[in-house]
Amino acid sequence: MAGLYLHIPFCKQSCHYCNFHFSTSQNNRDEVLTAINKEINQKALGFNDKISTIYFGGGTPTILTEKELNTIIENILKKFDVEKNIEITVEANPDDLTKSKLSALSNSVVNRISIGVQSFIDKELKSMNRAHDSKKAIKSIEMARKYFENISIDILYGL
């Protein structure tokens, strides 16, 4: 059993707790997406394990357009041998989740969404420089439940 993790290094803003590689500038977006697809092509050569899970993390994968995300997914599905019931997860920020974004994700092969809530306490969210508040977090979870059966949320402890 093998899995793929793809790091999408773009964010709208910098969250104070985050130590992952990301950029709030998207000046090189096309080049980065081209490089991701080239790396997929390279890694697939001679890779014989069957892929059971694909995880898009970040950064913020939902910053990508439907076309950009689907291009990457289609490339993976063409280049790698994947399980029939593969789990494909996309991380999302609550402020990115609209009905149209959730609909597009659920109509693709994405079958799990992981929402970066981090906290339901507005004071903590503000201190982390998160773009959403607790009401938006709850609303995003409620909306996601209409489109996905498999949902997880990230919560930071001990803030």
Region annotations inferred by a language model:
Residues 22-46, 51-159:
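Conserved non-cysteine loop/helix-boundary elements of the Radical SAM core domain that shape
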